Amino acid sequence: ADVSRLIEAAGWPVTLVGSSLGGHYANHLAEKYGLNAVLINPAAVRYLDPALFIGDHVNFHSGERFTFTVAHAVQLAAQVSPPTPGRYWLLSEMGDEVLDWRQAAEFYAGCRQTVLPGGDHSFTRFAEFMPQILEYAGL
């Protein structure tokens, strides 16, 4: 809801950037608001079994604990939106140990794609691609 308010209040075109599950949310918001998005090793939720994630988890960055419920799984499934090809740039590394890059490549077929050998889920080449991401966003 907070991101939606920021998008709605922006006085200029917004380009979203999301990785992992944030890539799923970026896709959802890009379709909702007609925006462009850069998706970095995104979760292609359509291919995932949400039941595998139900339970307690710890945020890797903050250490915060949270519980992923059946209601969350239903909510995620309802947010799956087929991508509009001209709006997305998929950045994936084949060495992603968390998500299968082929699922994202299939889901975003027809979209601009950069799929690189090696790497991992953190997208090890982020700094290398930052200038191109900013250019894609018109910044």
PLM feature spans:
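Gly/Ala-rich beta-loop-alpha elbow adjacent to hydrolase catalytic centers
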Residues: V17-G22, A26
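Structural motif
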Residues: P13-T15, N36
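Short, contiguous strand/loop micro-motifs
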Residues: W12-P13, L91
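The alpha/beta-hydrolase serine catalytic core
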Residues: N36-L139
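Active-site acidic short loop of glycosyltransferases
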Residues: G11-W12, P85
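Aromatic pocket-lining residues of Rossmann-like dinucleotide-binding sites
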Residues: L29-Y33
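Active-site catalytic motif of lipid deacylating hydrolases and related acyltransferases
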Residues: A1-A10
